[in-house]
Amino acid sequence: MVKIEKKLHKPLWLKIKLPSSDYKIKVIKKTMNKSSLYTICEEACCPNLAECFNNGTATFMILGNICTRRCPFCNVAHGRPLIPDIHEPEKLAETITNMGLRYVVITSVNRDDLYDGGAQHFVDCIRAIRAKNSATRIEVLVPDFRGHMKTALEILNTSPPDVFNHNIENVPRLYRHIRPGADYHRSLKLLKKFKEYNPSLPTKSGLMMGLGETREEIIEVMRDLRQHNVTMLTLGQYLQPSSNHLPVQRYITPQEFNEMKLESLAMGFTYAACGPFVRSSYHADLQNKGIEVK
């Protein structure tokens, strides 16, 4: 449990405007429950849930809803996960067909208990989706495959996604505090290796800001990402899911986010989404088209 010394007052630009009707939100939730599928939107208490669900979109979370790690910023449950559902790829593909989605994002919990970190399940989902929805573009947001990277990449390369995303999350100085069990350089290596195997595919990574990092440290991480051939970047404001999670150290202004976007584009990123509510999967379809998201 994280002890909070002082809670910062949330600025006006972080006030969320809720949709006038929650009908579509209820429909999405009912669809997920009926298919026994999970969304990271719900499990992580994403601030954009109402907007995305109201627009008929969601980020699917495969391999269960229990993570093998316990990161103090994350709201996803942790513990001993269940055996992967072998029917999940087919259920996922069917749901995507029924929802009429043309761009989907698939993520997962960490599965350090599996020999491949869950890579084969990702591939099974990609293949099932493409079999039913050949025109649907697929973005994956993967864990770091700790201890299984070589095996995981070999498996993913048999059916690569259209966009490969792995979030670096924050700066190396804070990793032990923010991402226990993760390694900054391992995450960079994963992104670089996938790009080496698939040079024509976009690689993407994102960071949360407001956890105690400095602007200079964020800039340095951006440089590291470019040096490892990452082409797309997302920067967003960290928001505390509950009083049991890491507190916000600072709220970044919209102007600062705009400045960071200019910095990133000057470094050579082909696309950058930088803003208070930006998450790596937030309007991912628009991000992939190069349309501004913030």
Swiss-Prot record:
Task: Quote the InterPro entries the UniProt record gives.
Answer: Aldolase_TIM, Elp3/MiaA/NifB-like_rSAM, Lipoyl_synth, rSAM
GO molecular function terms noted in the UniProt entry = 4 iron, 4 sulfur cluster binding; lipoate synthase activity; metal ion binding
Where primarily located?
cytoplasm
Matching SUPFAM superfamilies, A to Z? Radical SAM enzymes (SSF102114)
Q: Pfam families annotated for this entry?
A: Radical_SAM
Q: In which pathway does it act?
A: Protein modification; protein lipoylation via endogenous pathway; protein N(6)-(lipoyl)lysine from octanoyl-[acyl-carrier-protein]: step 2/2
Which keywords describe this protein according to UniProt? 4Fe-4S, Cytoplasm, Iron, Iron-sulfur, Metal-binding, S-adenosyl-L-methionine, Transferase
Cited NCBIfam families: lipA, PRK05481.1, PRK12928.1
Protein name per the record = Lipoyl synthase
